């Protein structure tokens, strides 16, 4: 039987970093799988989680509950066929967990999986942003939590800590809250039992151009690069995919990220020095360079305001070395 955990949290709370930490701590001899869903259509998290020792399935372009849950069911069934010891599911930061939890609790899956605790990540700084606090998905993700992971503790100031303490006092029902940084949590948390509770019914609006496929975007024919857009739930995503022959200037690329002034940027890019992984939430920019190159370059922006994508694209194209 496969043990299953839902890993939720709003945009930029550190879900992918936490997944990387958990996969690095995977016990020897165990087989793990990851089902990852993204709001955009480029498929960044799949590239970030590649080569982590787990079977990976991506569902890009919306939330797992869309299209009557068909992408979720197909992806879940494909992973369960290999009978992994554990399955970690990461829905989009703009997704609602209710339908996913209902599906995982359905009688048809009871012989195949054991649903364990839902872990919801929270950055205390998010509590200072009225737009985030008022967001339906943000509230409902926290309502679904069995354990709340207060992440990015190293970035908080005293006001953030006081705001988190005040929020925790008002939390109903009371649930464990664990403070951490870089998504570092004990592996034992995954074995915490799931607590079934009544969750709010979501009223979010799905994007009109929602993708129902089960694979991240690919290049067509002789195309060197392409762009993909997605809209919904008050946010827009714009992503770019470049072929393996395209290299980027790492300094110019990081400057482009700094100047973009958007809510979220994630990317895995080919540079002259190797693979550059980029993760930027507001003004928090993290990057690392690895020697092994990815098969292509992918970068994506998510923003809540109207954005001149053509201007950003023009500046991004100027970062290419070839």
Q: In which residue ranges do the predicted regions lie?
A:
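Flexible loop/N-cap segments at domain edges
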Residues: 302
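Nucleotide-state-sensitive switch-loop elements of NTP-binding domains
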Residues: 2-8, 13, 17-131
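Conserved short-loop catalytic and cofactor-binding motifs
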Residues: 60, 88, 152, 240-241
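Phosphate/Mg2+-binding loops and adjacent switch elements
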Residues: 86-181, 185
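C-terminal accessory "lid"/substrate-recognition subdomains
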Residues: 147, 155-295, 305-310, 314-322
């Amino acid at each position: 039987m496969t043990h299953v955990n839902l890993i939720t949290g709003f945009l930029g709370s550190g879900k992918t970093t936490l997944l990387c930490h958990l996969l690095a701590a995977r016990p020897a001899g165990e087989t793990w799988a990851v089902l990852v869903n993204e709001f955009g259509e480029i498929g960044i998290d799949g590239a970030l989680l590649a080569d982590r020792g787990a079977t990976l399935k991506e569902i890009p372009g919306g939330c797992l509950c869309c299209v009557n849950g068909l992408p979720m069911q197909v992806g879940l069934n494909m992973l369960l066929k290999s009978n992994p010891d554990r399955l970690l599911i990461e829905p989009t930061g703009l997704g609602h967990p209710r339908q996913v939890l209902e599906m995982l609790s359905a009688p048809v899956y009871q012989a195949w999986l054991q649903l364990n605790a839902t872990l919801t990540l929270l950055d205390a700084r998010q509590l200072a942003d009225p737009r985030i606090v008022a967001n339906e998905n943000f509230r409902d993700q926290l309502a679904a939590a069995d354990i709340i992971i207060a992440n990015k503790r190293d970035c908080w100031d005293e006001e953030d800590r006081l705001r988190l303490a005040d929020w925790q006092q008002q939390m109903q029902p009371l649930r464990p809250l664990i403070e951490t940084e870089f998504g570092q949590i004990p592996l034992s948390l995954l074995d915490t039992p799931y607590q079934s509770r009544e969750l709010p019914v979501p009223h979010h609006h799905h994007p009109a151009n929602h993708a129902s496929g089960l694979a991240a975007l690919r290049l067509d024919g002789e195309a060197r690069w392409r762009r993909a857009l997605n809209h919904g739930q008050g946010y827009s995503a714009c992503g770019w995919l470049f072929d393996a022959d395209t290299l980027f200037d790492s300094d110019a690329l990081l400057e482009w990220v700094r100047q973009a002034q958007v809510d979220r940027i994630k990317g895995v890019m080919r540079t002259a020095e190797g693979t550059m992984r980029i993760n930027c939430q507001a003004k928090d920019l993290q990057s690392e360079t690895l020697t092994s190159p990815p098969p292509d370059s992918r970068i994506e922006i998510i923003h809540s305001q109207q954005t001149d994508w053509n201007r950003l694209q023009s500046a991004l194209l100027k970062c290419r070395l070839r």
